[in-house]
Amino acid sequence: MVKPRLVFLSIAGPKDEQLYLEIIDPKEKHLLARYQYLGELSLDVINDLVNDGERTSNDCFLGLLGVEEDISTYAFYSNTKVKFILAVKAPDYVVKETEIRQLLRRIYTIHTHAVCNPFSMDLTPETLKTSIYFKESLHQLISDWNIH
């Protein structure tokens, strides 16, 4: 049985602008267009979920958005309307949503610390790409999760 592994992380701003996209496995960089497409599809699902008038839950974790072949996408929607999309490849393994929920909350915390840095005056989409704290913390979190 092949254990699950993270495929990509996408972070989108309040207006669905892409703030960050990280393809976890460097060998899959050639699949950038596919992962961008999955991220865009996920944004449509997120917007449908959060704009649903019947939605009663205030939980930021939106859960499983969809499955494309062997890649499952999950989402977290912050109170500032920042969207976190995480894709997991799990061909023969059931991924526990509680694990994904915890992982997305930790990513959200890392993101918050990076963009709320009082010493950084530059809060643009480049903030995450240039933040050493964000990159190192995220890479450590991802490597820990992939080997658990």
UniProtKB/Swiss-Prot annotation:
Positions of disulphide bridges? none
Gene Ontology CC, one term: TRAPPII protein complex
Q: Which GO terms describe its biological process?
A: endoplasmic reticulum to Golgi vesicle-mediated transport
Tell me the superkingdom of the source.
Answer: Eukaryota
What the entry lists under InterPro entries is as follows:
Longin-like_dom_sf, Sedlin
- Annotated PANTHER family: TRAFFICKING PROTEIN PARTICLE COMPLEX SUBUNIT 2
What is the protein's name according to its record? Uncharacterized protein C15A10.12c
This chain's source organism reads Schizosaccharomyces pombe (strain 972 / ATCC 24843) (Fission yeast)
